[in-house]
């Protein structure tokens, strides 16, 4: 879980555009964040299994 200071800092515009990075909106994780959903892989899987993300379904092939 990200500290509150990191979450607040992430919402401020960066001084340089190359310093901007994605962070999970739910838990604040900086790695493995899907831009389309704004969530990390762990939160995406949890919410997907609960059925809280419309249009998302488990793949089977």
Curated annotation (Swiss-Prot):
Cofactor(s), by name: Zn(2+)
GO biological process, one term: translation
GO molecular function, one term: zinc ion binding
Pfam families: Ribosomal_S14
Segments forming a coiled coil: none
Gene Ontology cellular-component annotations: small ribosomal subunit
Family annotation (InterPro entries): Ribosomal_uS14, Ribosomal_uS14_bact, Ribosomal_uS14_sf
UniProtKB keywords: Metal-binding, Ribonucleoprotein, Ribosomal protein, RNA-binding, rRNA-binding, Zinc
Record's signal peptide: none
Region (Disordered): 1-20
The keyword rRNA-binding is assigned to this record: yes
Domain of life: Bacteria
Residues annotated as binding Zn(2+): 24, 27, 40, 43
Keyword check for Ribonucleoprotein: yes
The record's free-text note on cofactor binding: Binds 1 zinc ion per subunit.
Biased composition (Basic residues): 1-14
Family membership: Belongs to the universal ribosomal protein uS14 family. Zinc-binding uS14 subfamily.
Subunit structure: Part of the 30S ribosomal subunit. Contacts proteins S3 and S10.
Protein task: Binds 16S rRNA, required for the assembly of 30S particles and may also be responsible for determining the conformation of the 16S rRNA at the A site.
The protein's name: Small ribosomal subunit protein uS14
Organism: Lactobacillus delbrueckii subsp. bulgaricus (strain ATCC 11842 / DSM 20081 / BCRC 10696 / JCM 1002 / NBRC 13953 / NCIMB 11778 / NCTC 12712 / WDCM 00102 / Lb 14)
Taxon lineage: Bacteria, Bacillati, Bacillota, Bacilli, Lactobacillales
Underlying gene: rpsZ
């Amino acid at each position: 879980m990200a500290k509150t200071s990191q979450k607040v800092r992430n919402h401020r515009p960066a001084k340089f555009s190359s310093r901007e990075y994605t962070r999970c909106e739910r838990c604040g994780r900086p790695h493995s964040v899907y831009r389309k959903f704004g969530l990390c892989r762990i939160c995406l899987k949890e919410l997907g299994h609960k059925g809280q993300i419309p249009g998302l379904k488990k793949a089977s092939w």
